[in-house]
Amino acid sequence: MALEIEKYGFEINGLRHVSGKESLEILKEAGFMIDVRPDFELTKLMNIEHILYYPYDEIRDHYQDLPRETWLIIVDAEGLRSKEIAIFLKDKGFSNILHLAGGVVEWERDGLPVTLDKSRRLSGSCMCQLKRREIKK
């Protein structure tokens, strides 16, 4: 049975925006979440099976590697850069593109599965001294 994508989210200028809960429903049927956050933002990981990581600064060079035959839900931290990438992919001929409205921030607010990767947390007394925190074992 084909996925009736029109029943999910809302569409603005040809791009369909979906919520986190709707994304989970869609991923049960078909598709991948494409996380475009840079490595330093990956402290909170969406704890789901079908997720691929293509950092924002690299996806334009590697978009050809993405599957075209299934739904791709583009996500970042708050939904700004991911929207830009979703539009880029549509312009490159991808027809099954969705955008996660509000990004990981809204995903977490909705109580959806998130894992905290403590090895990626930063430490430092000011922004100029930030570095990865060393985890004592």
Could you say what each language-model-derived stretch is?
Residues 74-76:
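Short, surface-exposed ligand- or partner-binding patches at beta-edge/loop junctions that are enriched
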Residues 1-32, 39-71, 80-137:
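Rhodanese-like catalytic fold shared by cysteine-dependent sulfurtransferases
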